[in-house]
């Protein structure tokens, strides 16, 4: 029999996992045990994969039922995860929780194919819920200039891939649900390929005049973007932008000239952000934008395990402008500033931070650093 009703939830979890259309389970379904057993993670930068290690857990098998050419596919939950998945889906029956979810008119899981890969948060929540179950270490084979990582797994099905490493050049990714490649009767149900879902962070700067005379003001601009905070814990989250001159630089920050904008909206000091060190005797200052991100990225009062669910600020432009008065000779090259951004690089631990330094020359972007999404 060919099922014609493909529920929204079925399509949703399929899309998230790299699967095509799937349908509700049937008594005569047969678990797929042969064929493809690989999943490939795709990255835009080698830094997203180089140095990373992974652990996995199988979430569900593929069940194929019916006769050619009217075969259909469903997901069969692995026994060891049934209790956790049923609890997450609020399923109180005794059957297969994913099979039950696939038969509901109202989707129980969602899809998201673009950054920051949140959707309505239901599938993101399931991946986070199961992350601790991924205890099997798996080795990947890197290819395509280290921008692809291919895993050979034990059997076909839906797998959860959990990044274990934080490197100096990239952050730890959120848990990733992915399906091994599956093709039946020339129909591709799963591509076996999915994005690593990291993004690239950088900070750049400009100076309006590099050879300002003593007693005059030099204008500086720092630009960066809000990193992907979705899936990170709200409590303890911190995103800062800082700038620094050499300790003997002949410059003095000019009070009341600091201006901070996000997405072309000027923010209010003391309310949207805090700033320390921006005074005439300092050579460095730090702007903390954490309060603004928390206000925009999470609704309500967070508890210990609350995570960001609103992605409106992700990737928005951040601009910092200020003036500094020249107090001595700056020579023919002016005085270079060194901006830095700092943010958590491990979704499970806000204490682990990534620092991205700005360029050493006067008007270049910094070396990029990668940060997650899923």
Per-range role (PLM):
Residues 1-29:
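Secretory targeting and sorting signals
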Residues 18, 25-48, 178-233, 242-245, ...:
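Serine/threonine-rich, low-complexity linker/repeat segments that form flexible spacers/stalks
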Residues 46-87, 91-99, 223-261:
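Low-complexity, serine/threonine/proline/glycine-rich extracellular segments that form mucin-like
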Residues 57, 225-227, 246, 290, ...:
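Solvent-exposed residues in well-ordered beta-strands and their adjoining turns
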Residues 92-167, 262-325:
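Extracellular adhesion/glycan-binding regions together with long Ser/Thr-
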Residues 135-145, 162-202:
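Long amphipathic alpha-helical scaffold segments
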Residues 156-186, 222, 235-237, 302-352:
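Serine/threonine-enriched low-complexity regions used as flexible
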């Amino acid at each position: 029999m060919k099922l014609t009703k493909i529920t929204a939830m079925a399509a949703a979890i399929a899309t998230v996992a790299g699967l095509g259309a799937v349908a509700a389970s049937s008594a005569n379904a047969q678990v797929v045990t042969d064929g493809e057993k690989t999943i490939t993670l795709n990255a835009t930068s080698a830094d997203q994969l180089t140095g990373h290690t992974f652990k996995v857990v199988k979430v569900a098998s593929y069940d194929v039922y019916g006769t050619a050419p009217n075969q259909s596919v469903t997901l069969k939950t692995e026994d060891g995860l049934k209790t956790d998945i049923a609890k997450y889906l609020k399923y109180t029956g005794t059957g297969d929780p994913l099979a039950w979810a696939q038969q509901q008119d109202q989707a129980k899981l969602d899809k998201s194919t673009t950054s920051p890969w949140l959707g309505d948060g239901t599938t993101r929540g399931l991946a986070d819920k199961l992350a601790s179950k991924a205890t099997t270490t798996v080795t990947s084979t890197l290819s395509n200039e280290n921008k692809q990582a291919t895993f050979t797994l034990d059997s076909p099905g839906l797998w959860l891939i959990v990044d274990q490493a934080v490197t100096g050049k990239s952050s730890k990714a959120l848990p990733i649900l992915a399906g091994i490649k599956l093709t039946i009767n020339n129909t591709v149900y799963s591509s076996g390929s999915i994005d690593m879902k990291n993004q690239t962070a950088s900070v750049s700067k400009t100076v309006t005049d590099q050879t300002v005379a003593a007693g005059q003001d030099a204008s500086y601009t720092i630009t960066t973007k809000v990193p992907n905070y979705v899936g990170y814990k709200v409590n303890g989250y911190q995103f800062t932008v800082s700038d620094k001159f050499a300790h003997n630089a002949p410059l003095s920050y000019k009070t009341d000239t600091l201006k901070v904008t996000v997405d072309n909206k000027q923010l209010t000091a003391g309310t949207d952000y805090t700033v320390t060190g921006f005074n005439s005797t300092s050579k460095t200052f730090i702007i903390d934008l954490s309060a603004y991100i928390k206000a925009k990225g999470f609704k309500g009062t967070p508890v210990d395990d609350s995570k960001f669910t609103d992605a409106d600020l992700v990737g928005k432009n951040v601009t910092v402008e200020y003036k500094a008065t020249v107090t001595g000779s700056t020579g023919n090259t002016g005085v270079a500033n060194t901006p830095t951004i700092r943010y958590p690089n491990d979704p499970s631990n806000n204490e682990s931070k990534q620092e991205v330094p700005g360029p050493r020359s006067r008007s270049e972007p910094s070396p990029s650093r990668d940060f997650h999404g899923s």
